[in-house]
Amino acid sequence: KSPRERAAMDTLRRLHPRYEAEVLAFVRDDPARLARTMVDLARILDGSRPVILAVLHDRQGGTERHVHELAALLHDRAQFVVLRPLPGQRVSLRLPDPDDAFELVFSLADEYDALLSMLRQLGVCHVHYHHLLGHGKPVMQLPQRLGVGYDFTAHDYFSICPQISLTRRDNRYCGEEGVQQCNDCLVQSPAPGGLDILSWRARHT
């Protein structure tokens, strides 16, 4: 900062010694969040279109683009909301448009029931799984807990190969030589949760 800016901050701190702490507390508590959420919900819940939950990974690329294109194609017939994983066993609920500021974050450990309640409030009537990378059982159980149907679109080999692309550590095609080869691969590059290949496939298929 310039000397002028530093001098202004020094004056501000002298006149209002609690200013910075109060600003940080305001940002942390976000008292306007509920009002913003209610406006966003009213915007989403127009009542004329069914709401579909698209489950995605936290990466960019073709899968994300497919969801955006699908939401645009079906815009007049359905409203999409997108669920992505976040660090710390959390998930983010957003609209497909990356420029839309609507976002709700839930801790799956502490706020799973709140997530279910929000999805019901949104009127989610179908779950479309596009990718399970970063997600665990709580997200896999959403259709059952919500009492709705689901679809699964396979965009890659993640359901049968934790490495996603049927490649070895040298990035060459593995040859798909059988269960033992897969388990040997998982010794070097473990699957999320440390599952063996048969347990992995049973969970994801």
Where are these predicted regions, by residue range?
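A short, charged, and often flexible helix/loop element on the N-terminal side
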Residues: 91-116, 129, 189-199
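Short N-terminal targeting/anchoring amphipathic segment
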Residues: 118-135, 148-153
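C-terminal, non-catalytic tails of nucleotide-sugar-dependent glycosyltransferases
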Residues: 2-51, 72, 76, 193, ...
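Short beta->alpha connector loops
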Residues: 58-59, 111, 132-135
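N-terminal subdomain of nucleotide-sugar transferases
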Residues: 39-96, 146
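Acceptor-binding helix/loop patch of EC 2.4 sugar-transfer enzymes
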Residues: 97, 156-203
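Carbohydrate transferase catalytic cores enriched for Leloir-type hexosyltransferases
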Residues: 100, 125-130, 147, 164-168
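Short catalytic/ligand-binding loop motif for oxyanion handling, primarily in non-cytosolic enzymes
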Residues: 61-62, 89-93, 135-138, 158-169
